[in-house]
UniProtKB/Swiss-Prot annotation:
Pfam families: EamA (PF00892). The chain crosses the membrane at residues 2-22, 27-47, 49-69. It is a multi-pass membrane protein. One of its GO terms (cellular component) is plasma membrane. It is found in: Cell membrane. The keyword Acetylation does not apply. This is Putative permease-like protein YdzE. Coiled coil: none annotated. The lineage of its organism: Bacteria, Bacillati, Bacillota, Bacilli, Bacillales. The keyword tRNA processing does not apply. Belongs to the EamA transporter family.
């Protein structure tokens, strides 16, 4: 329970800080990192096991965020 509260609070704080630096559509993308942060904190702080599905999911999340960022860069250049 502690880890869930801490990881969620950290994710919200970082997300709110990011919204101050970026516009809402770009900052909203980083909200998808919350499950990654929570799982990694569980692994580091509590010694939880991370399976292969976590790495697959992490890859998909990171790929999706990068894809959207690249598409937005193309729109800005046009």
């Amino acid at each position: 329970m502690y880890l869930g509260i801490v990881s969620t609070a950290c994710a919200f704080l970082l997300w709110n800080h990011g919204l101050q630096l970026l516009n809402a559509s770009s900052g909203g993308l980083f909200f998808f990192f919350q499950p990654l942060v929570g799982t990694l904190l569980g692994w580091i702080l509590l010694g939880e096991q991370i399976g292969g599905t976590f790495w697959i999911g992490s890859f998909l999340i990171l790929s999706g965020v990068l894809l959207v960022i690249k598409e937005k860069e193309k729109e800005v250049k046009s």
